[in-house]
Amino acid sequence: EDRVVSNLRAVGVKVWEKDPETGKQIRFTECGGHFALSLDGVGEGFKESDTPHTLEFKTMNEKNFKAMKNLGCKKSKPIYWAQCQIGMHLSELDWCYFFAVNKNTDEMYGERIKLNKAEAKLLVSKAENIVFSALPPSKLHEDPSNWQCKFCSYFAVCHGCKIPEVSCRTCSHVTPEKDGTWTCAKGKPVETCSEHLYIPQIMPKDFVVVDAGDDFVEYEDQDTGEVIRNQGNSQEIFDGRMK
């Protein structure tokens, strides 16, 4: 990032890497603070426009870099494009300068991305729905062979047998509040504890609920016939399935 910033300054772009009020990275929050995004900086003085741009820097392998050059950010890396859109929306700027470096050859690629207000608002709304939802979002596709699912980081959780890590967000007792805090129905400090109870809807599809109460859920593993009782022992009984 330092080299990229130096290169931008060398061609006359004024770059702010830190928030002048805090001295830290420029950061924005939504959803009461549950959702946050940081910028790599803000630049002003690009030859195409004097208006300030958010800055987003990425390094890529050869394959991803070639796709970026050929297709552009939105088509080759839609998740990066979405990040740029949210950054512009939260910072109230209309342009982003997206910069990528091929980590194998040091070749560079730059692209100006324009704010799409409707898309940006939709992305933030989607984040809010996920943050405050009591249940995990539905699968993008029911067919695990779909290409979007095959390349998703959560494929093993969504379509396979992997169980998410033990955390307050995967616990039935915990609720994210609108003011950015968390509430535990057990009256505990919001940190992983011995009373963790998985939200049943995030368990593997071969786990069928056969009994449940306020502080326990029993599952039958359809593959083995084993009955597993989740009652404050999530880490112990599911540890092997989290890997």
Predicted regions: what they are:
Residues 1-54, 61-63, 68-71, 194-197, ...:
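Metal-dependent nuclease catalytic cores that hydrolyze phosphodiester bonds in DNA/RNA
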Residues 18, 57, 99-101:
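Generic beta-sheet signal
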Residues 59-62, 103:
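Short, solvent-exposed aromatic-acidic interface loops
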